[in-house]
Amino acid sequence: MSHTLSRFASRRSAVLAAALAFTLLLAAVPRAGAGTPAGFAARAGLELATAAAQSWASDAALIYLENDEDVDASGAAARWGYLFYSPASRRCRVYSVRDGRILVAENLEMKFEAPPVTAGWIDSGAAIAAAEHEAGKVFKNSAGGHLSSMLLMRGAFDEVTPDRTTWTLVYTAPNQPSLFVVVDAAEGKVRRTWRG
């Protein structure tokens, strides 16, 4: 394996491990019941989460974003999770935003360095539109599936250009392998799909 591919695989493994830890942490927070707040697009909670993160560490940068509650067809979810990394402290902190407030703010006790997402990424609604146009709609209609998760990160699922920031949308259906759709977060184009 070449040095570049080995480095990519190592970084991808670290990012995926952090994403799993982040998801498990947020899964422990109860989901909204009756009176669920209105959903909002991923970018709508970014300013609040970024302000909180930069009060925690002035060099904090967004490295990962994921829906914490169901996301609808327009790209809105009642709660989104934002993970920040501070290079100076070599620590991560997660913020879960719902209804214009921070619901969770906790350090992630895992050591890893992850690249920040690039500026100018498309919002969750545009990512869904691209994924649905390419493969998501067909999967939903043919397999009775639904969009269960979407996450924004850099360098985990694009082996050709690993420094790109991408949205990864995961569609699930009963008794079927999941469908993964990777959307370039700058161009809004599908870069890759696979079942697994």
PLM regions and their residue ranges:
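Bacterial N-terminal signal peptides that target proteins for export
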Residues: 2-18
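Long, terminal "pre-/pro-" and other extracytoplasmic accessory regions
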Residues: 2-5, 23-196
